[in-house]
Amino acid sequence: MTLLLFSSLLSSEDVSDPFEDINRLTFKFNESLDRNIAKPTASFYQKFPTPIKKGVTNAFDNLEEINTSFNQVLQGKPLTALNDISRFVINSTIGIGGIFDVGTALGLKRHEEDFGQTLATWGVPAGPYVMLPVLGPHTLRDLFGRPVSSFLSVTFHMTDSDVNFGLNMIDALETRERLLEVESLLSGDKYYFVRDSYIQYLDYEIKDGLNIEDNFTDDMDDFLID
């Protein structure tokens, strides 16, 4: 869902949508779930004190550092991987389990990488666009990369399935809450907006924001990382 935030001004690789009819049906199903469950719950969570929400965001961002670091290595960026693993160690200890983002205060910038992006840097084409029930928009490439990224997630290796499920639900709730204030950006055909924004954001992430000049995108990237 966070991918809906990015403007349609970015250039991105060509991704076909041969399953549009099926994708639209799935999109309507997801919209129904969001309207009846996710959005009302996120609206309730929005009333929580900002420091609590900030701590939750930081903690879940911290859990993704291992996945990001591993993929940085696979993409041939060892120094960036060192930066990210350093963030994880510092924030997990001094930052009390990642609640406080000490790493950023020390000048260690946060990055986001997954195995789908790694496949892209290896030259694997995006493949067709697909909309999945509950999970939302994907390309075929990112769909194949998802199991590896899930395996590299810290929560995947938690032995208590109830705790694992609970953390994933809180993560989804936290992400949905951050979207409430930017829903006004949605315009025109919502399906096309979501699809195009998703593809453009993937391109932005794969290129690490290089050679892309878009102040709106920079602002939104800061919003997501904060």
Question: PLM features: residue spans?
Answer:
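Amphipathic, well-ordered alpha-helical segments in soluble domains
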Residues: 32, 36-40, 62-66
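A glycine-rich, hydrophobic loop/mini-helix early in the fold
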Residues: 50-77
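Mid-length scaffold segments of soluble, non-membrane domains
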Residues: 62, 72-137
